[in-house]
Amino acid sequence: MATETLPSSLDEVEALVHQLYKAGPPQQVSKIQETLQKLQRSPAGWELANGLLGSNSENVKFFGALTFTIKLNTDSQSLKDDDAQIVLQQIIGWLIKCLNSGCGPLVVRKLCTTLVTYFLHFSGSWARCISHLTYCLCLGEAVPYHKIEDAPTMAVLAQNLPDDKSLAILWFSATLVEEVGKTDSNSMKQHKFHEYVVQNVEDIVTILTKGIVNTTGVPINTKVRQESMKCFQSWVLYSHRAFLDAAIVLDPLRTLTQPALMLIIDNDLYEITVELFADILANYSSFLSENDFTMLYDLFSSSWAQERYAKLIQGDFDFDSVQFGQFLLSFGDATVQDLAQNISTDSRSQQILSALVGLLGADGYIVNEDKIFVPAVEFWAVYLETVLDLSYNVDASPPWLPAARSVLMQAIEKCWQKMQFPPKHEFSSWDSNERAAFKDARRDVGDLIQQSCMLLGLPLVSSFVDLILKSVEKGNAWGELEASLTCLAEFQDYIKEESDEYLDKVFGSPLFSMLTRSDSTVPSRTRQAFLMVINGYPEYFERHTQHLPSALNLMFSMLHSPTLARVTSKSIAMLCSSCRKVLVPELAAFLQQYSEINRENSVESYAKEGVIGAIASIIEAMPNDESKLDPLRQLLEFVQRDHERSLHLLSTQFTNAASNTQVPDGQVAADEVELTAIRCLISIGKGLQVPADTPVDLNTSENNYSYWKNGNGRGIQVQVLNILTAANEAFPGHGEVTEEISHVFRTGLVETDGPFAFPPEDVAKFIFRSNYQTPRVITVINTACSLINSCNTTLDERNNQVSSALLTWVSGLMEAINHEPSNDPEISQPSIEFLHRLISTPKNLHILLNHEPKSSLEHIFMFTLKALTGRDPLPKQSAAEFWASFVSLPTNNPDTHVQQAITNALQHLGPLLAQALIYNMGGAAARSELDKLSDPLRKLVVSQVRAKSWLEAALMDGNFPSDKVDQKEKMVFLTKVMNLRGARGTNSVVREFWLACRGSNFAYVS
């Protein structure tokens, strides 16, 4: 293939540049770019840059300036000092020619940027760059840098600069500090950028003074003023970086603060001035002096500011108006501590805080119209945090605190008004992003109100209770009522019994009857907000059972609303679970209510699941097992009907399929009905779980008799098992059915006894029906893990048989993936977790160690070691946990056969484990895995006397994954690990060694 010929003349290069800026095929443009880049980077690039800048075309000139930039970035280190000075003069010379010939700003700005690039590479030899560039522009020629010694004062030079050259200096100066400010800290120190830039601060202040302060009375070019303000902003932000990096304060800049602020009333300069001071207040308020803040206070009190503020509050959300609001908020953020502490004595603070409260009440809906509300809420969150900090850090309540509380209460009242939903037709007309943002803003208000309770206490609760009662009196103020209820629900974590008198007013009001109306005038949002209140105060209903019937009647009436059924059923379940004991006398009514729901088929399936779980929790609270039997039978009859309906539908669907008959429209699929039945069983199982705070009866008999497993209650278990078995057989390839059946069993596996605490062999039968091909078999393995935990709690010999059979089943899954964890990580992880749970109880060790055939046991151990060296994080984590437990097994097992088996296993597997751990720590593991992998290493060192020799052999093995560490470093690592004897510091040593093996710059030997 012939080598592509590069252009040999300047005209050819110019032609290529012109082609580049014309629309053309992407391939052609890419090829031109590639050719031009080769030319730019070639040794002739310097000459090319000069040639292109001599063109009459703006595009070609721009490309010439770009070529200088590229050459500086690629070849600056090869330039001698004299050559570098020549390049500087050439670039300045071209800038002067461009300005004199009236070039457009694109080329002038590019040349200014190129000069900044030059400074970044040669800052030491061009320290007073602004003074030198200004002198050259005034002279109209590029003179050597050392000639600035002959230059007049900067004030004289600045006064003699025409506007176009002033703009060039401003562009260069702003870009200079912006680019230096982007430099990382190491480069900043290495190149001493701060040291050199600081030498220019008085020079730039002189230039800026000309553009910002009108000392002559002659009108200043608007463009020069705007660019002066932008440049001033860049230098102020850079001064913040200089202060943070090196405690450098650029005091001369502060002389411009007040003159710059005065420009805010100039319409042409308003936008840049507001942006500048909002930026300073938000990011570097310490730049401003006390006098500057006084001037800002005066500004916000002026008629100009009052007019701006009034426009914003009246619903003008144009960019400039919102900018003013942001400016006011930035001032509030910067002075928030003073505002809070001076509120009771300083009229200026009162005025500012009053204005900040007002920002929360601007006309218009949040987000859709009102663009200042969300940042205003953020300010009040900062205000609250500040007041809390100031008031909690003193011994006595400060005198300003009541006034600070009062203004916060005013802010919250404004928030309450604004958080009310628009009319439904209005809200639905917004786009999805606006609706989501509106709801986010409401959550922000909720957070503010919740946190405010820490400062305002019960008076805040009382205020929302009063608002609720007023809305109830009005009868149809649904938006107000919804907002008030939503706010009241926020206090659930902060108020307890002391709030009962306020909640009495709410729950004793006509609110229940209002919201239980059968007509459609009550918005679903208002009902849902009341649900949130009920959910938030379950302990209240335990103390005030007289309100329980009203609450439950309301909830049951809401079950028929498609939009509220799911959340309502969950609320019913939560309330019944919390108040289960007091609801026992109402159990018959609940069963009757559920019977009607089932008969009418009037609610969604998920609503049935919630309600049936609620009833089960009431059954759990009955005084003895015998009393639970009949109501449980009634509950299971409902489930049985759904199950039988599913089987009937399934047979009908088979018949239709055989005869090519279409399934009738609207008919529910058989599997959906079956899933509803199984999920109802899950809800029943969860409802029957004994609450965690129930006292343990220490006098319970330790015999193995169980009413549910051995007595009259066994019929309940048999019925459930029959339903689950039939479902499993009817839908053998249905992963969701398999998963939900697993969940049913797991609800009982956490219980010591109960209707759903099945004998282990019953659960095992379900597990053994599954194999590697079973959809969602992972959930079945997890059930096996739960079952092994349950078996570990008793000494029953039958449990040992079940555990042994489960181990055989799990080993079969490992065999199905060819004993390679990477073939199916999702299967591997829970399988290894099963092994870990099996050995977590010493009495089960013999089950693992006596597993037959021995080849299968060896495969099991090797499977975990392969997972340990694999790339899949979850199996690796489980394997690390397994080995951390296995190597630290007690050495005094009373069963000598088991003890000998442990010893033999570790003698054979210890070196392999050490090799796997060292392989990971030698760089093969991910950094996030190191802490977990350090656990078996620490246990190995503590518990195994041969650990050092095993680890040393692994470090010296040919399979060690890194060549970045030598033998000496490996031995240092081993010595540190052994000396730590399993202490937590091992993790740090492992991390350091891993870094060294990865080839980082970390100096390991220290």
Which residue ranges define each predicted feature?
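Karyopherin-beta/Importin-beta family HEAT-repeat alpha-solenoid scaffold
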Residues: 2-1006
